[in-house]
Design a protein with these regions (language model features):
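Bacterial N-terminal signal peptides
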Residues: 6-18
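Positively charged n-region of N-terminal signal peptides that target proteins for export
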Residues: 1-5
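Active-site machinery of serine-nucleophile hydrolases
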Residues: 77-94
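Active-site and ligand/interface coordination hotspots across diverse enzymes
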Residues: 22-62
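A conserved mid-domain beta-alpha-beta active-site/ligand-binding segment of alpha/beta enzyme cores
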Residues: 186-197
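Extracytoplasmic strand-loop-helix segments at the start of, or within, the mature domains
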Residues: 53-55, 60-81
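Active-site histidine-anchored catalytic micro-motif
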Residues: 24-35, 96-188
Length: 197
């Protein structure tokens, strides 16, 4: 048993050393759920104080996957993280689905449950040393308003910077140019993005 403990300790030290020797553009080192607490402590806030939080939901999206609202913001976060020296928090895969909950595969979280959940996550990110919190939202409707409201509350109360980005707002002109229309839910906007991920 003692031998296993010593080998595990040596392996941990070796892997931790390898982590710091790696090129920081290596994506897995940007994902908070893929590093250990010692690596996290060495990175936040001394090397970065910015975090990307992908949010979405599970709901029908026509012919594409029910998790498209999660897939797109996470893929964007991986690209943005490399360019902005940010870490990526785990994707929040459940949201305020409302009108889609009658369809198979949809999951509805009420606003009354979602609002304090999001607030506690944002406060936890602040507590862990993040001063810049960027929410990359993959789902519209009431979820967008809740995210914006809670992010503003946390920014004021905790003296940090927050930003909510609805990625589809930036894709509107491109989808009009390529497809001749703006798209929308389960339309041209999410399908190409999720097809490229």
């Amino acid at each position: 048993m003692r031998t296993i403990f010593i080998l595990a300790t040596l392996l941990t030290i070796t892997l931790t050393s390898d982590f710091f020797a790696q090129d920081k553009d290596f994506v897995s080192t940007r994902e908070m759920d893929r590093i250990n607490w010692m690596e996290f402590k060495a990175i936040v806030p001394s090397k970065t104080n910015t975090v990307l939080l992908p949010t979405g939901t599970l709901e029908p999206q026509g012919v594409i996957n029910n998790g498209a609202d999660n897939t797109a913001p996470f893929a964007m976060a991986k690209t943005i993280a490399r360019r902005t020296n940010a870490l990526i928090a785990p994707t929040l895969s459940y949201g305020i689905t409302g009108s889609m909950e009658a369809y198979p595969g949809a999951f509805q979280i009420t606003e009354a449950a979602y609002r304090p959940f999001i607030k506690q996550i944002l406060e936890g990110l602040v507590k862990n040393g993040f001063r810049n919190i960027i929410i990359i939202n993959g789902h519209g409707g009431g979820q967008t308003a809740v995210l914006q409201s809670v992010a503003a509350e946390v920014a004021i109360e905790r003296k940090v910077r927050t930003l909510v980005i609805n990625w589809w707002s930036f894709a509107s002109d491109e989808t009009k140019e390529v497809f001749g229309e703006d798209g929308g839910h389960a339309g041209w906007r999410p399908a190409p993005v999720n097809g490229q991920v």
